[in-house]
Amino acid sequence: MADPTGISLAFGDDTLEPNPVWTRIDDPSVLPGVRVAGYQIDRGRASETTRTEGGSATVTITDRDGALDPTNPTGPFTTPTNKIQPLVQAAICRWNPVDLVWDTRFRGWVAEYDYTFDPSQQVNQLQLTLVDIFEILATVEMYPGGDFGDPPPAGSEGQVYYGAPATVDQANYRIERILTDARLGTLAGTVFTSAFAVVFSLNVNVWPATYSPGETALAAIQETVDAELPEIANAFTDRFGRLAVHGRQAKFNPGGVLAGPPPIDNTVWDWHHWYVGDGDFVNLNPAAHAQIRQFAFNHGRQYLANSAMAYPVSVTDATMNGQVYPAAGTATPSKTKYGIRSWSAPNLITAQGRYLSGGVTTVTDALTETHRFAQYKVANYGLPVDRITTIGFRPLLPADPRAGAVHRLLGKADISDQVDVTVPSPGGGGFNGAVFFIEGIHETCTGRLRGGVAAGAEGYDDVTLTLDVSPGPVDTSMFTPPP
């Protein structure tokens, strides 16, 4: 089926139809009385230290003819197979006036239609509230009886159980199992196929896990992701509306993950490395550097951690002390300077770490692997760093030599992309190619622009894009393959 364009809904398709038929509702040649006044998109998380939550979007519409009014008996969307109703698929796409392509910015489902009658009764105001795949997964409760998991061992009857006693699963396989049980994909052997999820670059094996009846599929997935490396491994919704599950190497070495083995193509992960900065930086290479329009940063104590502990569910009282890093009683410059700033990751289902080197996979045990999580935390958060709190972008006229870079960023920037920032400040400070990664995305559109666009051609969104970003890791040496 054709990809969505503009603001599109899939009126006639089921909620989980993998190839929906899209109707663009802001196309005046299709629905001349419908005008989109604007939209707001919010996805991701504020920083890497919080768990990613579901994304949402709102679309504000003026409906002069009642085309999108479900009480209109003669409207175009009233038949049983082509009807205005909740949980139809929805997409928000942005036109790139330089490259002349549509870029999907949000894909999900209509949660709510909210109608406000104008006092003149000549027009309706409609607000669409959209949700993403997290909402779908959060409403899938896991029940015993065969739909979810494996036959439970003795003593766990009545629970939902994944795994087999005394065995381990690869983390990506566990997540694919859960998604398959939730009817969001299929597994043929070890080959997972889904229109709604992509899972890759996980580097650990996980213990069997037991869930109480009523726990959600989303909670089980997030627990498995945390086994890879809490905070750094991530499950989020990408701009195509898919649940994207990335392991730690997707941040440590994105180029290596893309290269493989196995290689990852851009239909699975449309990763970009952006170069952004002030006007002087953009003028060095207008075709490749995108101009920042809003910028602020913080240098504070919030993310400091100089004493950490991470341990698996298999830990014992006798081995617990060994999971602290640095070891108890060890003095460090950070502790001396700032006092103890603690972080912990308890009861992880991590069973083994997997390391591929020279075509050979070696494994670490659960205690060793989770201890590395504590090492990573202290190595990368033991000192305060400069964190960007505001970074924003705006469109330019299509003929501007700087327009191509910024319109590509406006259309294709996504969670997990790398952003190198160059913004000098008075006195010689500032940022010079500082590496950050996108954690969250916020987009506010207040209408359409036609500057520099020929009569009858597609306009482009009057949009402000702001990003939540995290600093790139400083030290990942603890995750090198064992000798």
Annotated model-derived regions:
Residues 1-18, 28, 36, 42, ...:
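Surface-exposed cap/loop segments at beta↔alpha junctions
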Residues 7-9, 23, 30-39, 47, ...:
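Generic structural motif
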Residues 21, 94, 101, 108, ...:
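Residues in intrinsically disordered, low-complexity segments of regulatory proteins
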Residues 44-78, 200-238, 275-483:
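An acidic/polar, Gly/Ser/Thr-rich interaction patch typically located in mid-to-C-terminal regions
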Residues 90, 95, 240-243, 342, ...:
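Positively charged, low-complexity intrinsically disordered regions
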Residues 1-15, 19, 23, 90, ...:
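Short polybasic amphipathic segments
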Residues 98-102, 119-301:
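Charged- and aromatic-enriched interaction segments used to assemble
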